[in-house]
Amino acid sequence: LAVRHGDGNMSTQMEVVSVSTDKENQATLTTVRLKDKVYPFYIDVRYKAYEDVDMIETWTEISHTEKKPVYLTQFASAYLPIRRGNVWLSHLSGSWANEGQLTQEPLQPGMTIIKNKDGARNSHTSHAEVMFSLDGAPQENKGRVIGAALCYSGNYKLRIDTDDSDYHQFYAGINEENSSYTLPKGTVFQTPAVALTYSNEGLSGASRNFHKWGRTYKLAHGNTVRDILLNSWEGVYFDINQKGMDQMMGDIASMGGELFVMDDGWFGDKYPRKNDSSSLGDWVVDKNKLPEGIEGLIRDAKKHGIKFGIWIEPEMANTTSELYEKHPEWILKAPQRDPVLGRGGTQVVLDLANPEVQDFVFKVVDDLMTNYPEIAYIKWDANMAIMNHGSNYLPADKQSHMYIEFHKGFEKICQRIRAKYPDLTIQACASGGGRANYGILPYFDEFWVSDNTDALQRVYMQWGTSYFFPAIAMASHISAAPNHQTFRTIPLKYRIDVAMSGRLGMEIQPKNMTDEEKDLCRKAIADYKKIRPVVQLGDIYRLISPYDRLGVASLMYTSPEKDKAVFYWWKTEHFVNQHLPRVTMAGLNPDKKYRITELNRIDNQPLAFEGKVYSGAYLMANGLEIPYNHIVDYHKQNDYSSRVLYLEEVK
């Protein structure tokens, strides 16, 4: 904390004046009230300890009754000292189409800073979540681990100060750069919460704590399994039309899918949305593309027995749009400067600090749901960072509030939407995984892990993302080959096996698939419906990391009762006479017996252990001998191999 009091004094001397405890649903809320020794300046440090999950949230509330405003220049949410040698840090980094990359490193004397300055999204390049392994190099299923997650969707800063006596001081909160805040008398500045957990069962144990807490408290409908969907984007891109959407709906319905989502390209009147250079802000149906309108699409979805969803990007506009022509003052822009433009050379970000803009963004959703109440799903995108530091709404002396007020406005919009449409499913897409954070997930059901749907790269991205977020929140889609981002040709079996480890969906034009491919997807979707509760609501155990470069990656989910499990195995490299490690399982009941069934089998003959029964103790001590290659006809052989095994208790 750093402040400047109204008289210019830049010091604080806080002392505890009271400690109180209250019950709050399934949690105990402890408040430590601090007061400056001289000034009427107060800090309430809050600790919310959950009774049914191993998680504590902590945040601060800053207030004062000084005669003049107080100037806040640093305002961390939490401070955690760790007095321990040989501590390792696990954290995520990356970029667009390469999100969730895992980095693990020992903490050395000095300062480690993980921060974000995007403004609108905050999890492309780094994440506001970390894990500390207290017993040396990180291990997945043993060892003591502290996990921390800042529950915020805006600019953040995590800082770890390490001295030469093995003392680590961890700070987490809003990134104060360009965000100093003037606090008037009698108002309260509340920092976002930091969630803290502890596990003596390794990194996977800390992940299980985050997942259970997330599903129960920090994710919309977190304990309700998700629909299997087809999204139109990689199938047709902007080429939206009534007949094409009907065809895609019919195809996904025939494969057992439950939901169709029409992506970008459906809107615009004066400026029809033909590409990414126009129309954002003009949320009216393009009647040339969709002469029967959205009501016609919903009618087609009903005909095929599936639900209907739609894509929007309501926080954004294009300079080529009717909205911008009418309200140029609604965009974020520095005074006396031309705006820096984003995607398509025309994209700009709306000023969510402005209540009128908040009303407009809410109305985008409200109008859709009022006019078409049978819309079941909204894909909410955000394809631009805040590149223009300036708000026409905020006064000149409050411009440093812009980033903070933007996210306050965003949360207000989300709260209004959830209050009126509590049952609506909403995905947080932000140029892929830009909004994977626990600040906004209470208002969203899931997030799009990445715009990169390449199955091999998704193994790495989804592995890292699983450190903090449950499978039910991770949208994972089967896409085309060659892949549209990497141009890599990956067999359908492998693509399915990767997608089935998250919230399964499809991102493909089904009419370009062969009957054999559709049949494999049809069987996979049927099998996924059987294992869906285990994957989406179960406990994760990561077994072999792709980042260890052992040629294979493996993880599994177990049901809470440990009567069912799903085991995943993906080969990540291919060499002749390759040695791959034998994978031992985890999370099973050693005293129970499990029958093994392979899902998505393409081999000409069953695996040696197909249908056989093994004890949990055996599987966790010895594992199974997984063949390195598929036994298929010569012309179908390739360098990819993957397995999904379903384990079910035999009583």
Enumerate the predicted regions with their spans.
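Short Pro-Gly-centered flexible turn/kink motifs
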Residues: 181-200, 640-648
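Polysaccharide-binding surfaces and accessory modules of carbohydrate-active proteins
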Residues: 1-161, 177, 593-609
